[in-house]
Amino acid sequence: ITGNRCERGLGKEKVKNKLPNLFEYKMQRYFGYTPLKENEAVHGVIGIPRVLNMYENYPFWFTLFTKLGFSVLLSPASTRKIYELGIESIPSESECYPAKLAHGHVQWLINQGVTHIFYPSIPYERKEFADANNHYNCPIVTSYPENIKNNMDPIVQGEVDFIHPFLSLESEETVAYRMVEELGEKFSIDEKEIRAAVHDAWEELAACRNDMRKKGEETIQFLKETGNRGIVLAGRPYHIDPEVNHGIPELINSYNMAVLTEDSISHLNPVERPLNVMDQWMYHSRLYAAANYVKTVDNLDLIQLNSFGCGLDAVTTDQVAEILTNSDKIYTSLKIDEVNNLGAARIRIRSLLAAIRVREQRNTKRDIKPASIDKVSFTKEMRTTYTILCPQMSPFHFE
């Protein structure tokens, strides 16, 4: 019996798969911290939900609060039970699943009796790519703490101190200034102490990101030495959550392929710009950079994870596909939501493997093309021979 969620058929011995799985590595590297014991925490316990932007920045916040003398209580890895804890306060069915999970994580912290919960709104991430148009977080990641604040009764009724400052991670100084504002008076912490903690936290976050890059390079070297193939399972930081990705990384491992994350290779081949899209979203920039590296190597392919309800990914899927297919690489996208059914994913992955085998047999040489486009400027002379199509998107669009 095969074809179900199990990676082996009935009666077969389970074989330990030793191929790299960077989803598993990243989960451990980013969240494998040991908090202070409560009797050592001079400022008590502070809860942090394991959601959305925390998959990008938790090492920073853990280090900051630990250095300041807090015992950090992190909500557990997502499960269906966690999701159901907060289901009553979810305001819209059309939200992406990672956003819906946030309600359950915050409710779990409340159930533990935590009096302070920290979950910041971060419109700007650090600028990882200097030539990108900007470095925003998406609207959901940016403002979801506001949604939590207005839809969860214990917070609305003031039973919990919900700390949700708007701040930018563009620079260490910017964060330090805001943390002094938010934490200094509230917890009677000296400005110098906060700035020192922010510095240590900034260094720890940089170390985490460097470790991911090193692990990516090690995995690529491993694939070269062993002759194995790898899949870059590209998505958002929160797609490393097993409840969100539904075990797809392990499924790929079961087909004897290594699994890499987009941020483990996004530094290896800078994107040629300008792109066809406005490259202003931080997580998107990594997707484009990862695809730009994958197009240059034969033993890597890319599968993009796309959450239902993510409007911005309508842009990324087209751009990532364009970068890959222009250099004769295969683009595969997997849409995921709260439904835990890997049947369709298995079919897509098997189809990708079959297509790869066919291409290897043909041994066709690929023409690797830059990701940039040549934009044509509209000149005065074109007025007589060209028509501009510009649909009116709102009543005052042309005013």
Pin down the residues of each PLM region.
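An N-terminal assembly and electron-transfer interface module characteristic of large anaerobic redox
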Residues: 1-399
